[in-house]
Design a protein with these regions (language model features):
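Hydrophobic alpha-helical membrane segments
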Residues: 1-137, 141-203
Length: 203
């Protein structure tokens, strides 16, 4: 029981710590240009130090943030732009008085890609920790990785949904704890995806 309590306390404290680092880095980027590199930085810190919260240092976080700033923003806003175009296209289509079967099919395809874009960015967050990728290779490998492990994708969708439910009832947790937990979750569930891609790259 004592070890379980210690484990829970450590995880919650670590989640609060990295969430605080995340928000600080996000504001350093003026929010708009801080979100992507802040997420990439948190993933790198967690991959390096795991649950050893004493090893997390602002100086290292800031250094990683500066390294990640350009590439992470490029990838993040690529997916953001795709999402915006899809949403706007769907908005225009639903304004039509009578939708044909083909138009309904296009709407369904758009809905699928609305899920694929953020999913692919989550895969990118995992892969960028381990690979030094160009912009185009980041997009290609992340997109491929999103389809390599259906179980990981299912876990991500369910886990994100549950965190969303918790946020709905206790919004403060999102700003102080849940963001950190989400990054830990992404790191762990996409480990098989990383290992699969690494085995292909090495071979």
């Amino acid at each position: 029981m004592g070890r379980m309590i210690e484990f829970i306390f450590t995880r919650v404290y670590l989640a609060m710590l990295v969430t605080g680092i995340f928000w600080a880095l996000t504001f350093c980027g003026g929010i708009l240009f801080g979100f992507g590199p802040a997420s990439a930085t948190i993933m790198s810190l967690y991959a390096e130090h795991g649950s050893d919260y004493k090893q997390y240092a602002w100086s290292e976080a800031w250094s990683l943030y500066k390294e990640n700033f350009r590439r992470a923003n490029q990838v993040f806003y690529t997916f953001f732009l795709i999402e915006a175009i899809l949403i706007y296209g769907m908005y225009l289509m639903v304004q039509l008085p009578h939708l044909s079967l083909f138009q309904i099919f296009i709407l369904l395809v758009n809905l699928i890609f609305l899920l694929v874009a953020p999913l692919t960015f989550a895969v990118y967050l995992k892969l960028q920790v381990h690979f030094d990728l160009s912009y185009l290779n980041s997009l290609k490998l992340s997109f491929i990785g999103a389809f390599l492990d259906i179980r990981a994708v299912t876990k991500l969708l369910l886990g994100t949904f549950l965190l969303g439910v918790v946020t709905h009832f206790v919004p403060a947790l999102f700003f102080f704890v849940l963001l950190g937990l989400w990054h830990f979750f992404v790191n762990d569930i996409f480990q098989p995806v990383y290992e699969t891609i690494r085995s292909k790259v090495v071979s």
